[in-house]
Amino acid sequence: MPEKDAMISFEEHKRQIEEYQKLFPFYQTYAKVLKGILEKACKTSFPEAFIQARPKAVSSFAEKVVRKYTKYRDPVNQFTDLCGARVIVQTLEQVEAVKLFIKANFKIVEEDEKGLQLGEDKFGYRDMHYIVQFRPDTFSLFDVTPEDQAAIGERKAEVQVRT
């Protein structure tokens, strides 16, 4: 169990950053493939969906390592958001459709449904967060190259879906 007030050493911080820098190209590939698949999923039914995906910036990773070190002693292997995607759609029905697509095509490691939130304007919005991994059949369904499949492997990504 990590000590509550433990701080990461300079050497360990540097090692974690260097390790992530080595893995960064794999997460760039992951983001590219993930965005492409989400775009294909949304293209016909709701082409106005806004989709973005990216790997976590090295500077953001470095900051998070320090901030979360008491909980994560091996961040490069424990963080689940080193690749992230966001899908923004216009209606709750579209959120549900994207949600079904994600559940049908990815292994869900973790799911956090923020539920129907009411803002000051009284319009409801849904905010879903998933930690996912690619399933092997998803690779073949979307013609992901063997090279990209190898780069992605069993890495995890965070996918947010919201209105």
Regions found by a protein language model. Give the residues of each.
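Nucleic-acid processing machinery
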Residues: 1-163
